[in-house]
Each structure stands twice: as structure tokens, then as C-alpha cells.
Amino acid sequence: MPEVLTLGVKPNFTDYSEKERELIAGAAMILYPTANYAQFFTTLGKPFFPSLETCLYADEKIKQTTLFSMLGIPHPRTRIYYHLHHQDIVRDFSFPFVAKLPRASSRGRGVYKIETPEQLEAYLRRTPVAYIQEYLPHERDLRVILVNYEPILSYWRHRDPANFRANLHQGATPRFVGIPQEALSLARKAALQCKFNDVGLDLIRCRETWYVIEANMEYGREGLAMKGMNLKQILRDKLLSGELMPASNGQGNAAAAGRAAGVA
């Protein structure tokens, strides 16, 4: 991306050279800062992409669930249990249910279908904070990738019959046809409500209702690659068109800090 200068992430701002600090200060926009730098840039009034919310809610299932609840976004019944309340889980949920690691459970890892007390005990040995969710029977889920709140790709993920997780890394099969507009509208509305402007949302239809399961900020690129789509080029086009920048900034070069090294 020739319009972007990649500086990389450094733990101390003073580790950047004087020239690099000048570039950051003068950039029209910062691309893909870390969550820490995103907070600093917010205070400074420096435009950046993606949004602060996208950065802060990444890999934070507990925060996402609370946000969905507060915003009224349809989401499976979910409760959080700290160690002293682990015994309440079987009172509140009937087997089977889903248990997830609150963090580091991407690509289908750290997600468990709990069918017995023994499986629950094994899960609780993995995490002091239990994230418990009702099990929604399904044969497939829907991944919707949105950039700047607009869906750029959506596809079904048909799960492997031997695996309850509909994830490509867990053997699911992608299908790109028959995507319902109702689901795309919900995904776009949820992204706007949450202010997630670079995200892969997972949705499931169960009992005639669409549910938003979770938001993935580090969404996989496999689906994009299958359709011959280049995310870097998509972002470049949106950057040059001014879509990613406030209108007052116009079009121009953007100095990239933090995670931009993975995009530029």
C-alpha cells in the first residue's frame, strides 16, 4: 500500500525517532493502532482506523456479550460465573450448553459443547472465569465481514457432522449462495450500534430468530481468498476514496502505527 508508511509498534512512544513522531503527528490518519495507542489517539483527536471500539472489544467475549445485552442485539442467553459461583451453572443451564474461554478462543479453539458434569469440571479447570452460553442447535452459521460498516463478503459455514463448531478451521464447508438480506441487515445494524467498523460477525438462525454470536476483529482471510478478494486492496480503495477518513481531512497519505505492519 504505497500511500501508507508503516512504522511498526513500539512499547514506548519515545522509542520512535523524532522524524517518526513528526510523521505520526502530521498523518491524516493512523491505520491499525494497538488498543493502547488507539486510546491515546482518541484523547489527541487524531483520526484512526479501525474504531476505538473495534480495538477495545477484540478478543473480549465478556465485554461483547454485555454490550450486546445493553444494546438489545439478539444474542444467545449467556452468563458469566466467577469461581465462587461455579456451582450455580448447572442450576441455570441444562445440558448440553456451550462453554468458551473468555479470551483466546478464536478459530473455534477454546469453545466446548458441555454435555456432562465431567466435561464441565474439565472446562472449569481451564479458566477461573466461566463463560456459559445456551446451545443453539444448528447445521450452519453465517459469517459476515464488514469494513466501514458495509458487508464486503458473507458466507455460510456448514459444520462437519462430527463437530458442533461451524468454523473453517474445524472442518466446516463454506457456501457463498443464498445469503438472506435479513441477516445482512442485522449484521450491519449490530456493527453500527457497536461501532465495529472492521469486523467479522457470526450469526446463527435458530427458532426462527437470528442471533449475533460474536464479533471477530481478527477474522480469517480464507473466505476472502476463495472469492479472489484482496483485503489490502479493499482497504486501499476505501482509504483513497476518503471513506475511512473524516470528510474534513480529504485524501492524503496516512502514517501507519501499531498493527498497520500487518496491513500495509
Report residues per predicted region:
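Phosphate-binding site of ATP-dependent enzymes
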Residues: 111-191
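A short glycine-rich, hydrophobically flanked beta-strand micro-motif that places a catalytic Asp/Glu
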Residues: 196-207
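Active-site nucleotide/adenylate-binding loops and adjacent lid/helix of ATP-dependent enzymes
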Residues: 55-141, 181, 237-241
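Anionic group-transfer/hydrolysis microenvironments
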Residues: 102, 135-136, 145, 202-204, ...
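Short glycine-enriched loops at secondary-structure junctions
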Residues: 33-37, 54, 151, 157-158, ...
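C-terminal active-site "lid" helix and adjoining low-complexity regulatory extension at the edge
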Residues: 205-264
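Conserved N-proximal alpha/beta basic substrate-recognition cap immediately N-terminal to
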Residues: 1-80, 87
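Protein kinase-like catalytic core scaffold
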Residues: 97, 153, 211-213
